[in-house]
């Protein structure tokens, strides 16, 4: 029941935030850009962390673990290259991810592409998302230090790294 209520609440908030965002962007003549909505969502998740037991702590269903290349995942749901904020990654691990693959890391720090870089995509009544973020990141040296110090190891689940390069 908690899952259903949180799902309905999430959809309502997502709909409301994106529509208000688009309204203000239209009023001020700014290109449509979903990135402020994503930042709002991340900040909201982080700021209600005191409700973590109620909202975030989901028990991973029993007998749903999976083994891949001698690595044991507590769930077959794996977060792949979608966030780099440690607070947000911790929340997703609490919600039952079986493992995590960090965003692509490049040798040097990168800012990524200029905004707008996230937009809705609609094609023949199918909805999607255009993503042109452009691999922003802290660079490999800073990332390795972060990886050593991260508290994500406490979950004892596989952590992967996507490594990129320039041609």
What are the functions of these language-model segments?
Residues 2-158:
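N-terminal capping/small domains of soluble enzymes
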Residues 163-167:
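Active-site glycine- and acidic-residue-rich loops that bind
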């Amino acid at each position: 029941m908690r899952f259903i209520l949180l799902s309905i609440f999430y959809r309502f908030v997502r709909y409301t935030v994106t529509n208000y965002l688009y309204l203000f962007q239209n009023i001020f003549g700014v290109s449509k850009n979903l990135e402020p909505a994503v930042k709002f969502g991340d900040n909201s998740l982080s700021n209600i962390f005191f409700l973590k037991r109620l909202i975030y702590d989901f028990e991973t269903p029993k007998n749903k673990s999976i083994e891949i290349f001698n690595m044991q995942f507590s769930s077959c749901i794996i977060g792949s290259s979608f966030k780099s904020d440690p607070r947000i990654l911790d929340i997703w691990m609490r919600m039952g991810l079986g493992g995590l693959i960090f965003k692509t890391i490049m040798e040097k720090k990168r800012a990524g592409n200029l905004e707008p870089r996230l937009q809705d995509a609609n094609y023949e009544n199918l909805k999607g998302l255009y993503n042109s973020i452009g691999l922003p990141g802290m660079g490999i040296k800073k990332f390795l230090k972060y990886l050593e110090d991260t508290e994500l190891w406490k979950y004892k689940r596989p952590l992967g790294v996507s490594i990129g390069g320039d041609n």
